[in-house]
């Protein structure tokens, strides 16, 4: 049983890597072939590694882990926010602020300021302040919410971090590694996998691919918290979705 089937991965375009000239040689073992200048990710490995990631995240959630979803590229922002929220976890889906983890005390002060501004509005303080001052406070709140709203209620530094595109999120990954926080990530063919604890080889530029993987890890959290099996497993159709079929799909899409 696989938590994500080969068919689902194919339909979401998870197999499409980057142009061969943009590859990172460290990802060679996760690449099946090359077609028309594009690397094709070995989805048989993706299926297995997605299972490992699912189990790891599920078990962490069962032990009340705090899990942070990170994906600031436009293709990932919506899925990261939606799925982290659905799983009752936390997210950063705009620019990563340097020191978010390694300088957590300072970040907490900014979060406290965000909560203070919200409280001022709720208590009616805005009603007695000059309009210009209220406008400045609203501008400050909007900026704080944009960058910190997803971790506003995060009780502590996360126990696990899930990353979409560690090539883009290098600062976040380095901070996690410095603090010994395990990193699960969607890793495309252009990224360095060395600092990733659990690699999910995948196209991190397609919205459908990001949504599929991210939603599955949210399912893992929900299952872990509920302590029961969710209906998330699928039988892989090894005949209809063999590795040879992947090549045919790629050739067809790139014809």
Swiss-Prot record:
One of its GO terms (molecular function) is structural constituent of ribosome. GO terms for biological process: translation. It holds the Pfam family Ribosomal_S2. The keyword Nucleus does not apply. GO terms for cellular component: cytosolic small ribosomal subunit. Coiled coil: none annotated. InterPro entries: Ribosomal_uS2 (IPR001865), Ribosomal_uS2_bac/mit/plastid (IPR005706), Ribosomal_uS2_CS (IPR018130), Ribosomal_uS2_flav_dom_sf (IPR023591). Keywords: Ribonucleoprotein, Ribosomal protein. Transmembrane segments: none annotated. It comes from the Bacteria. HAMAP family: Ribosomal_uS2_B (MF_00291_B). PANTHER family: 30S RIBOSOMAL PROTEIN S2 PROKARYOTIC AND ORGANELLAR, SMALL RIBOSOMAL SUBUNIT PROTEIN US2M. Belongs to the universal ribosomal protein uS2 family. This is Small ribosomal subunit protein uS2. It comes from Streptococcus pyogenes serotype M6 (strain ATCC BAA-946 / MGAS10394). The lineage of its organism: Bacteria, Bacillati, Bacillota, Bacilli, Lactobacillales.
